[in-house]
């Protein structure tokens, strides 16, 4: 199962549904971007406030309740600007989530206002993603490596924290400090795109391996990748219970040293790694040719060299 976090906005969701979600052999759900056009690389989709679309976002969710689970905003200064303009975008995203009866996911890192001010606006069930970003404005201070007291308070109030390991959203030192302080993520996830599939994220088993190396028990890692996010998505998945859909990922443990890089360029050597062997969806084995994978975007990313990253 996949959760797409904001590729499409109100005006692009119909096309995203028709050409991506509906034909998919896997289960795909989506968050609707508060920018009406959706996520636009790093051009700053909300630097022009005319692209904020509360009404359209609410309508899009209501028309697609079976696949649209909530609202997404990328809350970085390069995306939303600064000051009142940035705050207006966050408030618009919150309004759309409130009016549609859904939850909001907030992307952080280079956050345009103090993280405490952001967290105090969030409601129980809202999600912060890129929680272990080494960038400024994260829930782990980029200088002191201390967990923000506001993050601890927000968690106690029901806000959830996601990893979303992509190109610039995971630091070894940040993750190590967070786990040592008892601030484990609610969800362990990848944020895969062309900027990170060849490093530093590679794939979800590689992200899982990083947490294994940091000392998290494998049972907890698996739960944070399967049953816990499945509940968040309202799916009868993430379980091997009799009668449940046979959605199964078969992982292998490769007992060989491998160097993993984080988003700051720091390398650490893991003495073993997880890699994907097989994936089944509703009992049907999914092979790369079924997914339409091209040579420049291989499925078995974890089998590639892992010594460098962007």
Tell me what each language-model feature is.
Residues 246-299:
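C-terminal cap of metal-dependent C-N hydrolases
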Residues 1-76:
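Divalent-metal coordination cores built from histidine and acidic residues
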Residues 77-198:
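Active-site core of metal-dependent hydrolases
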Residues 294-310:
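Long, low-complexity intrinsically disordered regions
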Residues 123, 241-244, 281:
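Residue-level recognition of short, solvent-exposed, well-ordered loop/turn junctions
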Residues 173-255:
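His/Asp/Glu-enriched, well-ordered alpha-helical/loop segment
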């Amino acid at each position: 199962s996949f959760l797409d976090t904001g590729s499409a906005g109100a005006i692009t969701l119909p096309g995203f549904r028709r050409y991506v979600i509906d034909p998919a052999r896997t289960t795909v759900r989506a968050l609707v971007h508060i920018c009406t056009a959706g996520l636009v690389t790093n051009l700053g989709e909300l630097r022009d406030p005319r692209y904020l679309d509360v009404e359209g976002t609410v309508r899009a969710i209501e028309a697609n309740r079976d696949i649209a689970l909530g609202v997404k905003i990328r809350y970085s200064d390069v995306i939303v600007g600064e000051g009142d303009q940035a705050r207006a975008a966050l408030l618009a995203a919150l309004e759309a989530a409130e009016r549609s009866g859904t939850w909001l996911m907030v992307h952080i890192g280079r956050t345009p206002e103090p993280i405490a001010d952001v967290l105090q606006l969030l409601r129980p069930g809202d999600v912060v993603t890129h929680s272990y970003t080494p960038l400024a404005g994260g829930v782990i201070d980029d200088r002191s490596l201390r967990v923000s007291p506001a993050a601890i308070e927000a968690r106690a109030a029901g806000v959830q924290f996601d990893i979303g390991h992509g190109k610039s959203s995971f630091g070894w030192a940040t993750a190590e400090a967070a786990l040592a302080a008892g601030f484990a993520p609610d969800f362990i996830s990848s944020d895969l795109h062309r900027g990170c599939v060849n490093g530093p994220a590679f794939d979800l088993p590689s992200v899982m391996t990083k947490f294994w190396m940091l000392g998290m028990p494998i049972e907890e890692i698996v739960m944070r990748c399967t049953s816990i996010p499945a509940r968040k998505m309202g799916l009868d998945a993430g379980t091997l219970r009799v009668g449940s859909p046979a959605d199964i990922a078969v992982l292998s443990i490769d007992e060989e040293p491998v160097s993993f890089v984080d988003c700051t360029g720091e390398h650490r050597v893991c003495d073993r790694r997880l890699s994907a062997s097989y994936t089944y969806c509703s009992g049907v084995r999914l092979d790369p040719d079924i997914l339409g994978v091209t040579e420049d975007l291989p499925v078995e990313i974890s089998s590639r060299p892992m010594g460098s990253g962007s």
